[in-house]
Each structure stands twice: as C-alpha cells, then as structure tokens.
Regions:
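N-terminal subdomain of nucleotide-sugar transferases
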Residues: 1-63, 234
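A conserved mid-protein helix/loop that constitutes part of the nucleotide-sugar donor-binding site
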Residues: 23, 212-235, 247-253, 341, ...
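Acidic anion/phosphate-binding donor-loop and adjacent secondary structure
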Residues: 68, 145-148, 176, 191-205
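Nucleotide-activated donor-binding/catalytic signature segment of Leloir-type glycosyltransferases, i.e.
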Residues: 253-274
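Acidic donor-binding loop of glycosyltransferase active sites
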Residues: 280-297, 312
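Short hydrophobic beta-strand element within catalytic cores of glycosyltransferases
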Residues: 304, 309, 313-316, 326
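Conserved acidic donor-binding segment of nucleotide-sugar-dependent glycosyltransferases
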Residues: 325-329, 333-340, 348-355, 369
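A short, well-ordered alpha-helix in the C-terminal region of glycosyltransferases
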Residues: 342, 349, 356-370, 381-382
Length: 385
C-alpha cells in the first residue's frame, strides 16, 4: 500500500548532519517514516544544502532573499531572537513570508497532509490556502507578538486549522485567550529515551576534578534566565557549565567573570552526539526560565526532557509549560521565576542530599517514559489519519 504524503513546514531545523540547531522537528518526523512519506520544507541557510535526505526525511530548503549570504533570519537560533540581535533583519520578514507562500503554492497539491510547526510564519502562511492543515504552537509564537495585524493573522490561522496542537497545558490556555472557540490538543515534543543515559558518562569531562557540575543547555536569550543562574552560583561550591549560544553570550560572560576564575565554563553550541555525553557527565540540570519582556515564554523545553532521560535531576522555574513536566519535590525541584535565593537553595539541596537526589531521579524516569518519541509520534499520526 502506498504511503500518504506528509508535508511538514518549520523554521527551526538542523541545517546539516551534526548541526547544533534544535532537532525536535526532525526527531518527530523520523519516527513517522514507516507510515508516511515525509517531506520537510524549511528556510535556507548559508552552507546548507537545498535538497537532502536526513534520517529518512526528505528536506527542501527554500531561498527567500536574492543575496544568499543575507539569509540569516532563522539561523542560528530563532526568528524573534535574531531580529532582537540585529534590528535590520526585520526587513527579511516579508521576503520569508512571500517565499514560503510561493513555494507552498507550487507543491501543496502533491501532499495529502500538511503540518505547520509554529503559528508564525508557517501557520499564518498556510492559512491563506484552502487545503486543511494541522498547526502546532510551541511557545513564543503563541505568547508574544499579540498586537495589531499579527494578532489578527494568528487568530485566523487558529480558526482555519483542521486541528490545533500545543506542546503544553499552559499554551492551551494562551491559545484559548486568542481564540476561545478553539480547543487544542496538548501533545508535547519528545525525547528519544534510548539515546540518553548515564552509560555516556565520561569522568572529569569538564575538567572539574572533584567539583560537582551544574549544567545549563539552551539559547542564551532573555527567556532562558541564565543571568539568575549565574547569580545563584555565587555561593554554591560547584562548577557551572553553560552550553549554547545567543545574543546575551557576551553579557553573560562578563557577568560570570565577576565570580571566581574557572567557576563558570561556556562551551558554545554542541551537537546532539556531544550533548549525550554532556548530560551524562554533569550532576544537576538547571532550567531557570523566565517570561521575557515581550511575553515570550517556554513551551515545554526538550532539553529538560533530555536531562531527565539522562538521569540528571532538574531544578527549574515555574515558567511556561515546565510545571506540566516537573512536580515540585516529586520528580524535580521548582522555584519562582527570577528568584535567585530559591534557585540557589534548590541546587544546594540536590548537591548535598543524596537521598533526595536519587529519589527524584527514580521518579523522573517514570515521568519521561511518557514522552518518548514513539509515543508522541503515534499521537500525531492518529490526528493525521
């Protein structure tokens, strides 16, 4: 029997094999190739191939600006942070919208099912076609930019969709604030639980010697709250390892420079393979996320799931969809946004209370089994059918 053809549109996707860009859309798609013929349509990026196959998924990268080296709106990182970093990039936005529209116009008829990840721009552009589609809200695409024409276009996108999904219960409420008649399904992104674990542990991987290691992985942007984590580490006898890049890197490095030498290490972006070792070789994972000034919030961070799948206890803030994943004192520890004292106390508890440490790790194993990509992909495929 011939497989149905699935077209997935997204704006965050690996640019090549071994890229440091988030790969959750690729992970989801690669778990569907047994039942669907999957194609992903994503923006082009300097150095990336226009056409290739990654893990059984056909990838089409569309160009959106005449000068190719200026196609920097989406990578590395995401559209809104890229614009914040350099305001001039906003001139690329209409080119991206128009190019996506024309590429969809050319190929939509070839596909049976359409799935748009993020309301902006994929969902909005898709709403200008009559073909039914599924749209998924991931976080800031739902919670921020809710004024004027963009808000109206987002509401149109939600109302026209055949099915709306969001990655957290928190985002479900935010969608219903925009369009009260819409009842989204809550289906998170996931984690390939078989690929993470303590089997990847490497002794003294960070050069920490006898010190414990607190780990952060993520984009160095406002909503990640790394500035509060650095402040919390001032009185903690441990090393902080920061993995990732972003517009706040230089500012955060300057802040870290005020602490004792060697207390904070910035490793930059790392590949998926490197992250397996990094997670397994740390002691505690911290996700001190906050609500950004423009309303941008976490959805359900995949890095938290990856930490849990690696057997790493998590300290996180009550921000966005995180409390859906972490229950305070049961499978992790939670603190209020921007509360440096609570963040410090929770990290200290995990570093000094061995019984608590192991109890939380055992509970998070039970939690994360529900977020394996085989389960998540199955839920999406039920919607497609």
């Amino acid at each position: 029997m011939q497989k149905k053809k699935l077209l997935v549109t997204a704006s965050t996707f690996p640019r090549w094999k071994g890229d440091t860009e988030p790969r959750f859309v690729l992970d989801l798609c690669s778990h569907m190739t047994d039942r669907f013929d999957v194609t992903v349509l994503v923006p082009a990026a300097p150095g990336a191939k226009d056409r290739e196959v990654l893990e059984g998924v056909r990838v089409i990268r569309y160009h959106y600006f005449p000068i190719r080296k200026w196609e920097t709106l989406c990578y590395p990182g995401a559209i809104v942070p890229r614009i914040k970093e350099k305001k001039i990039r906003i001139v690329l936005v209409p080119f991206l919208f128009l190019s996506l529209y024309f590429h969809l116009f050319k190929i939509l008829a070839d596909y049976d099912i359409i799935h748009a990840h993020w309301l902006i721009p994929q969902g909005i552009v898709q709403s200008f076609f009559s073909k039914p589609y599924v749209v998924t809200g991931h976080g800031g695409d739902v919670t921020s930019l809710n004024k004027g024409i963009l808000k109206a276009l987002k509401i149109k996108c939600l109302r026209k969709a055949e099915h709306v999904t969001v990655v957290s219960e928190d985002l479900k409420g935010k969608v219903q604030e925009l369009a009260p008649q819409i009842c989204p399904s809550v289906i998170s992104m996931g984690v390939d639980t078989g690929k993470f674990g303590r089997q990847h542990y490497v002794p003294d991987y960070f050069g920490q010697k006898s010190k414990k290691v607190v780990l952060f992985v993520g984009r160095l942007a406002e909503k990640k709250g790394v500035t509060y984590l650095i402040r919390a580490m001032k009185e903690i006898d441990a090393m902080l390892v920061i993995v990732g890049d972003g517009p706040l890197r230089h500012e955060l490095q300057a802040q870290a420079g005020e602490l004792e030498k060697g207390k904070v290490k910035f490793l930059g972006g790392k590949t998926h393979e490197e992250l397996k070792v990094i997670f397994a070789s740390a002691d505690v994972f911290a996700a001190p996320s906050v609500t950004a000034k423009d309303g941008d919030q976490e959805g359900l961070p995949t890095v938290v799931m990856e930490a849990m799948a690696s057997g790493l206890p998590v300290v996180a803030s009550r921000s966005g969809g995180i409390p859906q994943l972490i229950t305070d004192g049961v499978n992790g520890l939670l603190c209020e946004e921007k509360n440096v004292r609570q963040l410090k106390d929770n990290i200290s508890k995990l570093l000094n209370d061995e019984e608590l440490y192991h109890r939380l790790v055992e509970e998070e194993k039970k939690t994360i089994s529900n977020y394996d990509y085989r389960t998540i992909a199955g839920r999406y495929m039920e919607i497609y059918e």
